[in-house]
C-alpha cells in the first residue's frame, strides 16, 4: 500500500510502471468504444492495452483496474478469455506465447508456411464474427491489435 493518494493501487497498477499505471487510471475514467495507443517502441503500450482489456473484462473491477482474482482476470492472464480477441503477427504471437488458431499453428509446424511478421487477412477475419451475439461472460468484448502497423492492407480492410 502507498501513502500517496495520486498513485493508483491494484493488481494492474502493481504490474505496470508508474507512468503506465496513471495512464490506465485515466483511460478507465474516460472509456470509449475504441482506443489507439501509440508511441515509440518499448514504452509498454502492449502492457497498458492488456491491463485495460483485463479491467474492462473483469467481473469485479476496482477504480485502479482489474481485481486480479476473478475467473475473467485469470482467463485473460492465461490467454483463454473468450471475449478477448488479440490480433498479432504469427511471429510475435509465438515469441509472446499467445495461442494461434489450430490451422495456422499446424501449417507453421509442418513448415507449409513461415510465421509471418504481418497480421494476415486470415487472422483478421474472425473479428467480423466477433461481436455481441458471441459474448461469453459479460457485456464487454475487446479486440486488441498489436502492433496495428503490422496489419496488411487486406487485413485492415477486413477489420473495418
Show where each model-derived region lies:
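Clamp-loader machinery-focused feature within the broader ASCE/P-loop NTPase space
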Residues: 2-154
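Surface-exposed alpha-helical interface segments used for non-catalytic interactions
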Residues: 157-158
